[in-house]
Amino acid sequence: MHLFMKFSSKPHFQSTIILIYQMAPLPAENILPIIFLLLIIFSVSKAELHAHYYDQTCPQVEKIISETVLKASKHDPKVPARILRMFFHDCFIRGCDASILLDSTATNQAEKDGPPNISVRSFYVIDEAKAKLELACPRTVSCADIIAISASNVVAMSGGPYWNVLKGRKDGRVSKASDTINLPAPTSNVSQLIQSFAKRGLTVKDLVTLSGGHTLGFSHCSSFEARLRNFSSLHDTDPSMNTEFALDLRKKCPKPNHNHNAGQFLDSTASVFDNDYYKQLLAGKGVFFSDQSLVGDHRTRWFVEAFVKDQSLFFKEFTASMLKLGNLRGSRNGEVRLNCRIVN
């Protein structure tokens, strides 16, 4: 008996899987396991992300999200950096499942209220996009996909690369503040960063590349002031910092500091997505200890130097790493939330 099966990539499969079985006639009890195997393969294929996921069910999804993000960014220039950070923090914990959007309840403290996420902002942008999508395509587009598409939009509109976002994520039903301890900290050294990224299947190259997202970033003093005073028994200021840069930061972050909005942009072209972040690191002007440590370790420095020399290389690698980050999957039992802040 010849059994031929073909699973097409249209409309919901990223790749074509062809299974050809050549066998003699089999009794029914031997055919059932084969059918079961094929059903499993079919299910896995169906779960794959792909660029055309909403082509039939919500063809205007990209337009609605991009218009919403652009409008918000014009009103508040910090939106691009906030959306990009939101995407990273969401994917890094439970996979890209929009768990960062869920509000805390009387019985559960959610991710957004965990210490590293207290400063994550601009959730309203995702809320607005979701509301518009529910009117246009009810119960169709996941909040997780909205974050992913928004992240691509903010990079492109800031002068960075554009990539066609793979879609089809589901929204998770679990969000715990305690899980945020797994996020990389601005005080982490290279070994800690490498270990943290490796747990999520991300390489050293992904680490250095995704750190380049800080080209749009801003930090409040609390995340780096430990580098400015009483750094160690030998040095008052972190010796890896440029001396003049350290003095400038001390002025912006005095002790005591009564300005809770005080801080520093993470590179000198904060509204433009470029390779200036890496140039600042080579000049000793990395704001976070974790950032500056990338040039002090042979495992990461050569990536920094390569991106300084070739911005197009950085853009290419950033696109690849963002797609890889976006493929970190959440729960297989997810849903499409009607409201991004609460489970259905």
Where are these regions (language model features)?
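Intrinsically disordered, low-complexity basic segments at termini and long loops, enriched
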Residues: M1-Q22
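Catalytic cores of secreted/periplasmic or lumenal enzymes
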Residues: L19-N344
